[in-house]
């Protein structure tokens, strides 16, 4: 909002007038008890004049009133920035010094003023008198030589010297001094007092006292007989008149104040804090939960980080207790990416350990097929493998796992190396050498890539690769033993890497989902890029919610992303890739891609837009991603939600998907007849909102509805239906002459419409539509109902008797002819030259 300079200045002047009038009113209405309370209030260290004026004077509230409003509104000095200052004690000390200074000055003025005439004084000059006169002359010479300064200037210098380092205290003291401490005497009288008192020195108290006691009686003539009064600190009435344009002051300015609230000065703008020690002291004194601004946000962020770190350390301690061989994790503060990596690492280790302890009972029925596969591979002769240019021998044992590589014969430096992993594999996964070992014949794993000269094992977990890298040693070629597998090797054209197929235990396979009792849950292979894209979508709040992936829903923080929970309590996310992979033991060979349409069992509980059936809600359980906006990492957590929560979430998603919002149709002709958006919306919705908007309700409330309207309808029904199809033809065939209409409505409207070329063109354009009499009567009734409701509401709000008469007259009209429908459509069109008021003037002109 932009405020002009004129309005701003006028508002400020008016605000100052309100404050001035408020102070005068407060001074006139205070009694003795109120004065004592007010004196205590202004003596408080944290008292601020600006805050007091904003709270009471601008709002015209008497702080000493005994009404309910006065008792509710109390002045709180803690809200003022002055009360939060660390130097409130200095402020009170300076106020005490000011009061002591004024009291002392008054006492000195009264006691040590120049002596008046006295008859008891002698005129004899003694040596003591000479000495006192000399001392008096010296004092006068010193006072005249020194620069004259008023008490107010000395007081200002004293204040500046005391509170030079504290701007807030200086400002508060300045406010108190200028509001309540300004002298009330006239300028001439104050100058005389300053001139008379300037020569008095407080240090020579005894000398002046002796001089007063022993002064000669002739001093009466030389001394001034005028006795000055003490300085008064009472506020004087303001004599200057100001404009008070109360009508030009906006409500916002008068109620809440302008930017600096019309005070003497803005204390809040002065923020001069000395060192960092004061800030630490303030933080200790203030309540951390009540802190606002940047400091409060930073403090609460540190609290949240400390709580997160405590939970991470607690989980790590529990994990170390249950798994003794897990790696030790440093207790330093981990932030962001390091925490996520640590969580992923721990999750992978736990998953690998749980897979190693899977019982072999579920695999007994598959031993025959996997054993036949392994024997077929062992039947290959070593001579055929040596004919290839590149050969990789892989030996897997229960205790030792070896990798042997042989390079081409034309290579001068033939390198034969093996990598041996002894008991490290079992130690990593929580197994000892004496425990049950792997059975190589039972399972198969995915193929992976191996670069020349590099040896790496995939799908063993991150910790296995780290712990075994230090123990890799080069060994000679070892003979093959029973149970060893020699994989086939093939070279890709135009590439310098080898791809091979190896047989590893199925428990080490990370991308295969655990078996269900029926064996129909299929595994998915997702590349790193696909996983990264899915994770980014989840973090951003965008997720695919239906099976076919035809649309996506954007969710705000705190809402839910629906996922499926299968029979084994495992989360089934919606697939990014439409292809699915079957396991090797099901296909009898390598992994085979199966299209989505060939799957035997359809997944349940997939969200479909608009589907809120009981089967969807009650079939199984639902999980949801809950996005927590307070989580700094932005990683969604997974938790189970109730059916009611799922139902509300689906409603929310449906509202985001649906684009068929109900439009507010101003014209009745825009409604599609027979559709839910026309009949139900006009009749049903209007009845539920306001019964007066229902034309049938208005008809029943009118007086002569049952007597006249129903009888007329019964008499004229047959006539109208017979002549319904004839009136429009009669009008189209007429050439400027009014035809002999049968219905009363057509007869009365013929002078207005017959001869109107625009209406005739309108009828020729839209008269081709064929409606039955029932449809026409319903369409015409909509227009009549609109006019009834319009005039009845006008009668209710404006007490217009003419509108009541017209509404009652519309209830007597029952038209089913196509001519009356054309009249209504033409009158309702925006470009028509005839309105409903013209029709009503002709139809109901019975006065």
Swiss-Prot record:
Q: Which GO terms describe its molecular function?
A: hexose transmembrane transporter activity
Highest taxon of source: Eukaryota
Q: Where is the composition biased (Polar residues)?
A: 116-126, 368-378
Bias type Basic and acidic residues, positions: 128-145
User: A GO CC term?
Assistant: membrane
**Span list, region Disordered:** 116-153, 208-245, 361-392
**A Gene Ontology biological process annotation?**
monosaccharide transmembrane transport
Q: What is this protein called?
A: Uncharacterized protein C03B1.7
């Amino acid at each position: 909002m932009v405020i002009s300079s004129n309005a701003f200045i006028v508002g400020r002047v008016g605000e100052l007038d309100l404050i001035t009038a408020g102070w005068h009113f407060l001074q006139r209405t205070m009694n003795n008890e109120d004065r004592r309370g007010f004196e205590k209030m202004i003596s408080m260290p944290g008292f601020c004049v600006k805050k007091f004026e904003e709270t009471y004077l601008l709002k015209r509230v008497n702080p000493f009133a005994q009404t309910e409003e006065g008792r509710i509104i109390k002045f709180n000095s803690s809200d003022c920035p002055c009360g939060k200052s660390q130097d409130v004690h200095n402020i009170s000390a300076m106020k005490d010094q000011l009061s002591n200074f004024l009291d002392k000055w008054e006492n000195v003025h009264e006691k040590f003023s120049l002596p008046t005439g006295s008859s008891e004084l002698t005129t004899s000059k003694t040596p003591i008198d000479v000495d006192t006169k000399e001392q008096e002359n010296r004092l006068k010479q010193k006072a005249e030589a020194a620069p004259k300064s008023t008490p107010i200037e000395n007081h200002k210098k004293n204040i500046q010297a005391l509170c030079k380092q504290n701007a807030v205290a200086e400002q508060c003291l300045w406010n108190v001094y200028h509001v309540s401490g300004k002298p009330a005497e006239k300028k001439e009288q104050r100058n005389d007092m300053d001139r008379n008192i300037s020569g008095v020195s407080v240090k020579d108290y005894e000398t002046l006292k002796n001089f007063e006691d022993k002064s000669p009686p002739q001093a009466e003539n030389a001394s001034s007989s005028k006795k000055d009064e003490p300085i008064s600190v009472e506020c004087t009435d303001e004599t200057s008149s100001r404009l008070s344009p109360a009508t030009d002051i906006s409500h916002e300015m008068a109620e809440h104040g302008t930017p600096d609230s019309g005070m003497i000065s803005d204390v809040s703008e002065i923020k001069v804090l000395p060192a960092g020690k004061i800030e630490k002291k303030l933080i200790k004194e203030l309540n951390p939960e009540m802190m606002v601004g940047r400091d409060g946000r930073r403090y609460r962020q540190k609290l949240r980080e400390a709580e997160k770190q405590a939970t991470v350390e607690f989980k790590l301690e529990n994990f170390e207790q249950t798994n003794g061989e897990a790696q030790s994790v440093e207790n330093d503060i981990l932030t962001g990416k390091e925490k996520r990596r640590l969580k992923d690492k721990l999750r992978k280790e736990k998953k690998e350990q749980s897979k190693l302890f899977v019982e072999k009972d579920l695999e007994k029925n598959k031993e025959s097929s996997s054993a036949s596969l392994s024997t077929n591979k062992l039947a290959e002769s070593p001579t055929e493998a040596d004919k290839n240019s590149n050969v990789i021998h892989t030996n897997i044992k229960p205790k030792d796992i070896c990798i042997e590589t042989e390079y081409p014969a034309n290579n001068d430096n033939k390198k034969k190396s093996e990598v041996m992993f002894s008991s490290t594999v079992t130690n990593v996964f929580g197994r000892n050498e004496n425990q049950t070992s792997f059975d190589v014949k039972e399972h198969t794993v995915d193929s992976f890539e191996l670069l020349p000269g590099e040896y790496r094992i995939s799908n063993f977990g991150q910790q296995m690769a780290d712990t075994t890298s230090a123990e890799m040693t080069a060994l000679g070629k070892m003979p093959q033993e029973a149970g060893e597998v020699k994989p086939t090797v093939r070279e890709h054209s135009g590439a310098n890497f080898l791809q091979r197929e190896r047989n590893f235990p199925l428990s080490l396979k990370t991308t295969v989902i655990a078996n269900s009792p029926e064996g129909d849950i299929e595994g998915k292979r997702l590349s790193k890029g696909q996983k990264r894209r899915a994770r980014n979508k989840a973090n951003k709040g965008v997720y695919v919610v239906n099976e076919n992936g035809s649309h996506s829903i954007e969710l705000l923080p705190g809402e839910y992303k629906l996922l499926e929970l299968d029979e084994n309590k495992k989360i089934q996310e919606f697939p990014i890739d439409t292809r699915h992979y079957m396991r090797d033991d099901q296909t009898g060979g390598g992994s085979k891609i199966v299209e989505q349409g060939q799957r035997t069992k359809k997944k349940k509980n997939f969200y479909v837009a608009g589907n809120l059936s009981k089967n969807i809600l009650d079939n199984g359980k639902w999980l949801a991603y809950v996005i927590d906006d307070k989580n700094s990492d932005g990683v969604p957590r997974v938790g189970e939600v109730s059916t009611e929560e799922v139902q509300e979430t689906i409603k929310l998603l449906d509202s985001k998907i649906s684009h068929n919002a109900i439009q507010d149709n101003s014209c009745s002709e825009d409604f599609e007849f027979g559709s839910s958006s026309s009949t139900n919306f006009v009749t049903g919705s209007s009845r539920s909102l306001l019964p007066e908007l229902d034309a049938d309700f208005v008809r029943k409330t009118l007086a002569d509805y049952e007597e006249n309207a129903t009888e007329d309808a019964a008499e004229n029904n047959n006539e109208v239906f017979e002549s319904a199809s004839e009136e429009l033809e009669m009008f189209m065939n007429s050439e400027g002459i009014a035809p002999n209409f049968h219905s009363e409505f057509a007869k009365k409207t013929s002078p207005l419409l017959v001869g109107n070329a625009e209406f005739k063109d309108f009828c020729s354009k839209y008269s081709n539509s064929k409606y039955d009499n029932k449809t026409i009567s319903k369409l015409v009734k909509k227009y009549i109902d609109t006019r009834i409701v319009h005039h009845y509401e006008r009668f209710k709000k404006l007490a217009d008797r003419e509108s009541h008469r017209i509404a009652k007259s519309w209830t007597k009209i029952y038209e089913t002819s196509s001519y009356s429908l054309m009249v209504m459509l033409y009158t309702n069109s925006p470009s028509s030259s005839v309105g409903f008021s013209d029709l009503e003037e002709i139809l109901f002109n019975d006065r």
